[in-house]
Amino acid sequence: MIKYGIIGAGWRSEFYLRIAALLPSEFSVSGIYIRNSEKQKKFANKYNVKICSSLEELLKTDFDFVVSCVNKDNILEMIKTLAAKDIPVLTETPVTDGTLTGRVQVAEQFHFMPRNLAYKKIIESGILGEVHSVRLSCCHDYHAASLIRFFLDTGFEKPEIISISLTDPVTRYNSRTGYLKSPAVIPAEEKIKVFKFKDKTAVYDFSFEQYFSDIRSSQMTIRGTNGEIVNNTCSYLKDGVPQRFEICRNTYGSEESLDGMCLFNITGGNVLYTNPFPYSRLSDEELAIATCLLKMKEYLDTGKEFYSVKDACFDCHLFKI
């Protein structure tokens, strides 16, 4: 059982509450620190969780570590406050100060998204040859930077960066709070960046509308000397002959399946990803965050980092955040 306290009552904090509610044998929330009285009432009614009106009250609860979900303007100060008390912290992004000390890891979840782990498994198999190029349109700013480094294995190499910004007129019909009553065309900003490393390249192309829109889909291309992945199709050469397979999500709960709605695994010739929480009704985002929680406990037990303050700061620097 992994026990954690939560600081903050924003949109991100609810992911950690849902994970504990859906996986009660794996995770437990010791309490959540909320300053706003209206939000205290809302969360008390919505979740079976202890509401703490002060940080001191939260820190008296029984936890392995604290998850900080404060707004980005207060992230660094909260980390410093908890580090001074020797409290281990899993903090939400972004983290822009690489000099922070203490037992801190950053919840960069995109490394642990099922499809991205499947891509990484294909890369590590060697069938693509030497991977040298990534083109991604799936997440914003520092998250994209972390994925670029994850797939290209460029470490802390500083690339040359070319940036442009375009306007992408698109109908906004959905948001964090659900479908809009009056969809309307908006001038969405589309950011494009080209990263030129010593012998590798990456192209970033993203609009925030993609997170909540089915008319602006995610795209991924990973290229190597012997093959490529384009979204869910992998093409490569074997003994000089072109081969191809589809990357397939295998789920429960569709049609006549009575096992409940969930992702079981991802396959493509071989098993590329297996859900560590089988039969759990978690979205891919929630699976990735739950994996961060597992990694945080492993970090505390072994000292093995999974996404450090240094990593987070470097990725923010690539987008000048």
Regions found by a protein language model. Give the residues of each.
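Beta-strand-loop-alpha-helix segment that lines the small-molecule cofactor/substrate pocket
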Residues: F63-M113, G126
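Rossmann-like dinucleotide-binding domain that binds NAD(P)(H)
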Residues: E130-S217, T221
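NAD(P)-dinucleotide binding in Rossmann-like oxidoreductases
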Residues: T201-T291
